């Protein structure tokens, strides 16, 4: 093996070429000669995988005939050459591989092929060692009924009064390549592989849009995104594991908290971790609440019932909630104030030392639910809703024989507001109205038929109404209905080149107002409620839609408008 390896090195290092090493990219060639790197790239036999053989045996990898030993060695040769280009090269004409070269189809951009192969190996090693539990299989079978965008908001409204404080923060989209290497250092022990990956990341191969489109595999930026945010989510889950579980419960059973939080890590991301395509194509946006009580087994519940008398109600309900959409995150706890300051410093040190951020204490905000120091006007944007914690005064008048007793009870109320200004900006960008909210015709839909135009407007209107069915300011939905209704009428008038009166005579005044009722699930899942339409009863009931799973694009567009505001 050593003799063959030395001959292979001499064959490519001592090749008779008149070129000189000029670019920094040519230094990448020497990293390919490591023994552990070949089994990652060349997927020939199980024996050649080395220490990664157990990983590749578990996954049924479809062999791509365009990615072979010979093609990658040709890529290495092109790195060493001076005239590096994307066109096909025939440099094996005087070698014994000339006959095999005719059967192979060399890729036009070999550097990008190698770059994609490295990220494939990263995802295999990160994801393939994890097994599904019975709880996770049962969870994904009922995925359509249980997963919803509005489910975290509904549970937050139901349980937020038990939370004494919380944290809210936001982190940037951009990160340094060394941060990714620092994260991958936990899984990889191959130093040459990490150095080669560092070279690729510092060359910014993946940044330009033109290079990403020509890569044969899926988008590489989503892989870097997922690796980065998986590290952040695992940190917050580990904080809650060490911070929320009471000491008396841990004394009863040592594995009590570990068994609970292992299920949380499997249940976190709403993307099956063993599916290889989802990690490339989709970004991981968790919309679920991590609750230490609802995920316990039957045995753990028996232990909890046995110590109910010894633990108070607040210690027993050590519920924490962690939310994250895109870059915004929330954590709600039940602890005292001195411990909150330590937790805030812990989070800041993680962002500074682990992720290389330059943060101050003001970057992580307090979201105190029961505190007189909280500002009533403070609002937080989350899941395309505006969260506020205003004070509500209840007036109580007690009538006695002699005089009246008047009392005021002040309590905190959580409110979910509809960001009407951001929705108007989004509709104006799509040419449904101007920036002030005055509707106008959609000129791009003039070539469609009348039924297609009406159906698309009603579909857009119903999606917005279903998404904001849980907001407290339902009057803002009337403004959205006004914009979409008159925009539909103006597009039909522009198509037929008539006035609005003719359109109302032809189609009627209830153009986009169709009577419909749909069954949805609210907080009490044992009962079915019907969502009453705005135009049927002139009032919309405030309910949570637990079947709303496909409006991620609306959330991300509104978040971009909120950041640019």
UniProtKB/Swiss-Prot annotation:
GO terms for cellular component: chloroplast. Keywords: Chloroplast, mRNA processing, Plastid, RNA-binding, tRNA processing. This is Maturase K. One of its GO terms (biological process) is mRNA processing. It comes from the Eukaryota. InterPro entries: Domain_X (IPR024937), Maturase_MatK (IPR002866). Belongs to the intron maturase 2 family. MatK subfamily. Its main location: plastid. It comes from Staurastrum punctulatum (Green alga). GO terms for molecular function: RNA binding. It is found in: Plastid, Chloroplast. HAMAP family: MatK (MF_01390). It holds the Pfam family Intron_maturas2. Usually encoded in the trnK tRNA gene intron. Probably assists in splicing its own and other chloroplast group II introns.
């Amino acid at each position: 093996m050593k003799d063959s390896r030395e001959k292979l090195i001499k064959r490519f290092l001592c090749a008779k070429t008149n070129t000189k090493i000029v670019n920094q990219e040519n230094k990448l060639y020497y990293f390919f000669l490591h023994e552990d790197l070949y089994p990652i790239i060349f997927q020939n036999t199980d024996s050649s995988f080395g220490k990664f053989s157990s990983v590749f045996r578990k996954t049924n990898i479809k062999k791509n005939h365009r990615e072979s030993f010979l093609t990658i060695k040709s890529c290495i040769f092109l790195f060493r050459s001076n005239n590096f280009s994307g066109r096909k090269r025939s440099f094996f004409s005087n070698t014994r591989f000339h006959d095999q070269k005719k059967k192979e189809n060399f890729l036009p951009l070999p550097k990008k092929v190698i770059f994609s192969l490295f990220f494939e190996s990263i995802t295999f090693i990160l994801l393939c060692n994890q097994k599904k539990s019975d709880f996770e299989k049962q969870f994904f079978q009922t995925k359509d009924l249980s997963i919803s965008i509005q489910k975290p908001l509904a549970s937050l409204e139901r349980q937020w009064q038990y939370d004494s404080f919380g944290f809210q923060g936001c982190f940037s989209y951009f990160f340094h390549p060394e941060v990714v290497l620092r994260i991958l250092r936990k899984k990889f022990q191959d130093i040459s592989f990490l150095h080669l990956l560092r070279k690729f990341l510092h060359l910014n191969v993946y940044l330009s849009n033109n290079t990403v489109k020509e890569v044969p595999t899926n988008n590489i930026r989503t892989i870097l995104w997922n690796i980065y945010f998986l590290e952040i989510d695992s940190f917050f889950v580990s904080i809650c594991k060490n911070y929320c579980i009471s000491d008396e419960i841990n004394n009863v059973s040592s594995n009590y908290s570990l068994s609970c939080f292992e299920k949380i890590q499997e249940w976190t991301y709403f993307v099956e971790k063993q599916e290889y395509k989802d990690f490339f194509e989709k970004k991981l946006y968790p919309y679920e609440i991590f609750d230490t009580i609802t995920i316990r087994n039957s045995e753990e519940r028996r232990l909890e019932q046995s110590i109910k008398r010894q633990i108070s109600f607040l210690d027993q309900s050590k519920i924490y909630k962690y939310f994250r959409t895109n870059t915004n995150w929330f954590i709600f706890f039940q602890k005292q104030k001195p411990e909150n300051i330590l937790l805030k410093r812990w989070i800041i040190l993680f962002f500074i030392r682990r992720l290389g951020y330059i943060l101050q204490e003001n970057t992580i905000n307090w979201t105190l639910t029961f505190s007189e120091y909280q500002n009533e006007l403070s609002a937080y944007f989350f899941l395309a809703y505006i969260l506020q914690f205003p004070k509500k005064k209840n007036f109580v008048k007690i009538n006695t024989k002699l005089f009246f007793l008047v009392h005021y009870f002040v309590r905190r109320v959580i409110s979910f507001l509809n960001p009407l200004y951001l929705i108007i900006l989004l509709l104006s960008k799509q040419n449904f109205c101007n920036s002030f909210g005055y509707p106008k015709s959609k000129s791009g839909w003039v070539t469609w038929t009348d039924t297609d135009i009406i159906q698309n407007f009603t579909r857009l209107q119903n999606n917005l109404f279903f998404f904001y069915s849980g907001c407290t300011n339902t009057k803002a939905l009337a403004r959205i209905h006004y914009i979409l209704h008159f925009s539909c009428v103006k597009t039909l008038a522009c198509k037929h080149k008539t006035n609005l009166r003719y359109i109302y005579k032809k189609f009627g005044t209830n153009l986009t107002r169709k009577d419909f009722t749909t069954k949805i699930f609210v907080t009490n899942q044992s009962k079915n409620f019907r969502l009453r339409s705005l135009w049927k009863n002139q009032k919309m009931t405030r309910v949570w839609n637990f079947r709303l799973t496909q409006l991620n694009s609306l959330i991300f567009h509104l978040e971009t408008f909120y950041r640019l505001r």
